[in-house]
Amino acid sequence: MAGYRKLGRPTDQRKAMLRNLVTSFLKHGKIETTETRAKETRSIAEKMITLAKRGDLHARRQVLSFVTEEAVVQRLFEEIAPKYAERNGGYTRIYKVGPRRGDGAEVVILELV
């Protein structure tokens, strides 16, 4: 059994999509996407927040290797991480919205708690 979801894409496209989803999620605090993408994004975003809570230079560089925008990394370390200083994991929440009109895929909202 695989440790991650393939999301029907080649590796490079999947990584690029997840980087963009995580960056958008941390930038806006919530995103609307399909359920499987949200679950995969949630996993990575929680790791990024945990790294940001550490707050040192190495953690910042590790986050920068994945998140595509410097401003988002700044926001993550200065606003988001301090907010969750006392919380051990579980920084995100997934709400089901319903099926998407075009193809019936289950759409959810992924947001910060």
Curated annotation (Swiss-Prot):
One cellular-component annotation, GO: cytosolic large ribosomal subunit
Segments forming a coiled coil: none
Pfam families per the UniProt record, alphabetical: Ribosomal_L17 (PF01196)
Superkingdom, natural source: Bacteria
Protein's recorded name: Large ribosomal subunit protein bL17
Description of how the protein assembles with itself and partners: Part of the 50S ribosomal subunit. Contacts protein L32.
GO biological process: translation
Organism phylogeny: Bacteria, Bacillati, Bacillota, Clostridia, Eubacteriales
NCBIfam families in UniProt: L17
Family statement drawn from the similarity comment of this UniProt entry: Belongs to the bacterial ribosomal protein bL17 family.
Alphabetical UniProt keywords: Ribonucleoprotein, Ribosomal protein
Gene this protein is translated from: rplQ
GO molecular function annotation: structural constituent of ribosome
Organism: Clostridium botulinum (strain Loch Maree / Type A3)
